[in-house]
Amino acid sequence: MPYEANVTDVAYRYDGSFAGFLCCVFESYARHEIPSEVCSPEEGQLNLFGTREILTDRQRAKRVAVGLDRLGPQVKDRIVTGFLSTDPGKDLTLLRFARRCFAQGPQAVQMLGDPDVAAAFAIERAVNNEAGKFIEFIRFEERDGMLGTVIHPKHQVCLLYTSDAADD
Protein backbone atom coordinates (compact mmCIF):
# COMPACT_ATOMS: atom_id res chain seq x y z
CA MET A 1 0.00 0.00 0.00
CA PRO A 2 1.90 3.09 -1.18
CA TYR A 3 -0.16 5.61 0.81
CA GLU A 4 0.67 6.12 4.47
CA ALA A 5 -2.11 4.51 6.50
CA ASN A 6 -2.57 1.76 9.02
CA VAL A 7 -5.44 -0.67 8.63
CA THR A 8 -7.29 -0.65 11.95
CA ASP A 9 -10.00 -2.73 13.62
CA VAL A 10 -12.20 0.31 14.20
CA ALA A 11 -15.29 0.85 12.05
CA TYR A 12 -16.47 4.28 10.96
CA ARG A 13 -20.18 4.95 11.38
CA TYR A 14 -21.73 7.96 9.64
CA ASP A 15 -25.18 9.34 8.85
CA GLY A 16 -25.42 7.87 5.33
CA SER A 17 -25.18 11.21 3.49
CA PHE A 18 -22.59 11.99 0.84
CA ALA A 19 -21.23 14.82 3.01
CA GLY A 20 -20.93 12.31 5.86
CA PHE A 21 -19.00 9.95 3.59
CA LEU A 22 -16.62 12.76 2.65
CA CYS A 23 -16.09 13.37 6.38
CA CYS A 24 -15.11 9.69 6.71
CA VAL A 25 -12.48 10.25 3.99
CA PHE A 26 -11.26 13.32 5.89
CA GLU A 27 -11.08 11.41 9.18
CA SER A 28 -9.19 8.54 7.56
CA TYR A 29 -6.69 10.96 6.05
CA ALA A 30 -6.27 12.97 9.26
CA ARG A 31 -5.71 9.88 11.41
CA HIS A 32 -3.53 8.08 8.83
CA GLU A 33 -5.73 5.00 9.10
CA ILE A 34 -7.98 2.81 7.01
CA PRO A 35 -11.00 1.61 8.98
CA SER A 36 -12.05 -2.03 8.88
CA GLU A 37 -15.53 -0.92 7.80
CA VAL A 38 -17.47 2.20 6.91
CA CYS A 39 -21.15 1.79 7.72
CA SER A 40 -24.25 3.90 7.42
CA PRO A 41 -27.19 3.67 9.86
CA GLU A 42 -29.02 1.16 7.63
CA GLU A 43 -26.16 -1.31 7.89
CA GLY A 44 -25.75 -1.23 11.66
CA GLN A 45 -22.62 -2.42 13.42
CA LEU A 46 -21.05 -5.24 11.46
CA ASN A 47 -17.97 -6.01 13.54
CA LEU A 48 -17.05 -6.89 17.11
CA PHE A 49 -14.50 -4.13 17.54
CA GLY A 50 -14.90 -0.45 18.28
CA THR A 51 -16.98 1.92 16.24
CA ARG A 52 -16.05 5.55 15.74
CA GLU A 53 -18.98 7.88 15.09
CA ILE A 54 -18.07 10.32 12.30
CA LEU A 55 -20.14 13.48 12.54
CA THR A 56 -20.99 15.35 9.36
CA ASP A 57 -19.06 18.59 9.23
CA ARG A 58 -19.83 20.68 6.13
CA GLN A 59 -16.43 22.40 6.23
CA ARG A 60 -14.53 19.09 6.24
CA ALA A 61 -16.77 17.67 3.53
CA LYS A 62 -16.16 20.77 1.40
CA ARG A 63 -12.39 20.41 1.81
CA VAL A 64 -12.55 16.82 0.56
CA ALA A 65 -14.91 17.83 -2.30
CA VAL A 66 -12.46 20.55 -3.38
CA GLY A 67 -9.67 17.97 -3.28
CA LEU A 68 -11.72 15.63 -5.47
CA ASP A 69 -12.33 18.49 -7.91
CA ARG A 70 -8.57 19.01 -8.14
CA LEU A 71 -8.11 15.31 -8.98
CA GLY A 72 -10.36 15.70 -12.01
CA PRO A 73 -13.79 14.68 -13.23
CA GLN A 74 -12.98 10.98 -13.65
CA VAL A 75 -12.10 10.55 -9.97
CA LYS A 76 -15.00 12.64 -8.70
CA ASP A 77 -17.54 10.97 -11.02
CA ARG A 78 -16.38 7.51 -9.97
CA ILE A 79 -16.90 8.36 -6.30
CA VAL A 80 -20.22 10.21 -6.79
CA THR A 81 -21.67 7.51 -9.05
CA GLY A 82 -20.29 4.72 -6.87
CA PHE A 83 -21.95 6.28 -3.83
CA LEU A 84 -25.33 5.58 -5.48
CA SER A 85 -24.64 1.84 -5.24
CA THR A 86 -26.45 -0.22 -2.64
CA ASP A 87 -23.77 -2.91 -2.55
CA PRO A 88 -22.54 -3.73 0.95
CA GLY A 89 -19.02 -2.50 1.54
CA LYS A 90 -19.13 0.16 -1.17
CA ASP A 91 -18.32 2.90 1.36
CA LEU A 92 -15.03 1.29 2.38
CA THR A 93 -14.18 0.56 -1.26
CA LEU A 94 -14.77 4.18 -2.26
CA LEU A 95 -12.85 5.47 0.77
CA ARG A 96 -9.85 3.32 -0.17
CA PHE A 97 -10.14 4.49 -3.79
CA ALA A 98 -10.23 8.14 -2.69
CA ARG A 99 -7.17 7.62 -0.50
CA ARG A 100 -5.34 5.99 -3.42
CA CYS A 101 -6.17 8.92 -5.71
CA PHE A 102 -5.14 11.53 -3.13
CA ALA A 103 -1.82 9.71 -2.69
CA GLN A 104 -1.04 9.03 -6.34
CA GLY A 105 -2.87 11.77 -8.21
CA PRO A 106 -5.40 11.68 -11.04
CA GLN A 107 -3.52 8.96 -12.93
CA ALA A 108 -4.53 6.49 -10.20
CA VAL A 109 -7.99 6.23 -11.78
CA GLN A 110 -6.38 4.31 -14.68
CA MET A 111 -4.54 1.80 -12.46
CA LEU A 112 -7.05 -1.03 -12.82
CA GLY A 113 -4.45 -3.55 -11.65
CA ASP A 114 -4.78 -2.06 -8.17
CA PRO A 115 -7.52 -3.81 -6.15
CA ASP A 116 -8.91 -0.55 -4.70
CA VAL A 117 -9.18 1.08 -8.13
CA ALA A 118 -10.61 -2.05 -9.79
CA ALA A 119 -13.27 -2.44 -7.10
CA ALA A 120 -14.34 1.22 -7.39
CA PHE A 121 -14.46 0.85 -11.19
CA ALA A 122 -16.70 -2.23 -10.86
CA ILE A 123 -19.10 -0.39 -8.55
CA GLU A 124 -19.32 2.60 -10.91
CA ARG A 125 -19.85 0.33 -13.90
CA ALA A 126 -22.66 -1.59 -12.15
CA VAL A 127 -24.52 1.65 -11.33
CA ASN A 128 -24.04 3.09 -14.84
CA ASN A 129 -25.11 -0.19 -16.49
CA GLU A 130 -28.29 -0.32 -14.44
CA ALA A 131 -29.03 3.34 -15.17
CA GLY A 132 -28.58 2.69 -18.88
CA LYS A 133 -30.85 -0.33 -18.74
CA PHE A 134 -33.64 1.60 -17.07
CA ILE A 135 -33.34 4.65 -19.33
CA GLU A 136 -33.66 2.40 -22.39
CA PHE A 137 -36.52 0.21 -21.23
CA ILE A 138 -38.59 2.43 -18.95
CA ARG A 139 -42.13 3.06 -20.18
CA PHE A 140 -44.37 5.79 -18.79
CA GLU A 141 -48.14 5.72 -18.61
CA GLU A 142 -50.59 8.54 -18.07
CA ARG A 143 -52.97 8.59 -15.12
CA ASP A 144 -55.05 11.59 -14.14
CA GLY A 145 -52.99 13.89 -16.33
CA MET A 146 -49.65 12.78 -14.86
CA LEU A 147 -46.95 10.59 -16.30
CA GLY A 148 -45.58 7.86 -14.08
CA THR A 149 -43.91 4.49 -14.03
CA VAL A 150 -42.92 1.86 -11.52
CA ILE A 151 -39.35 0.63 -11.41
CA HIS A 152 -37.42 -1.43 -8.89
CA PRO A 153 -33.75 -0.54 -9.33
CA LYS A 154 -31.07 -2.30 -7.35
CA HIS A 155 -29.04 0.90 -7.00
CA GLN A 156 -30.16 4.50 -6.47
CA VAL A 157 -30.07 5.30 -10.18
CA CYS A 158 -33.03 7.71 -10.26
CA LEU A 159 -30.70 10.55 -9.28
CA LEU A 160 -28.80 10.02 -12.54
CA TYR A 161 -31.96 10.67 -14.58
CA THR A 162 -32.58 14.21 -13.36
CA SER A 163 -29.91 15.72 -15.61
CA ASP A 164 -31.23 13.72 -18.60
CA ALA A 165 -34.77 14.98 -18.03
CA ALA A 166 -33.60 18.58 -17.63
CA ASP A 167 -31.79 18.46 -20.99
CA ASP A 168 -34.95 17.56 -22.93
Please name every model-derived segment.
Residues 2-58:
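N-terminal ordered "arm"
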Residues 16-18, 142, 153-155:
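Short, flexible loop/turn elements at secondary-structure junctions
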Residues 22-23, 158-160:
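Short helix/loop capping segments that flank catalytic or ligand/cofactor-binding pockets
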Residues 51-131:
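Charged, alpha-helical interface segments at or near domain boundaries
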Residues 111-114, 148-152:
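Flexible, glycine/proline-enriched loop segments at strand-loop-helix junctions
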Residues 128-148, 162:
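Type-3 copper protein
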Residues 150-152, 156, 163:
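Extended, Lys/Arg-enriched charged tracts that mediate electrostatic binding to polyanionic substrates
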Residues 161-168:
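Conserved small/polar residues in nucleotide/adenosyl-binding loops
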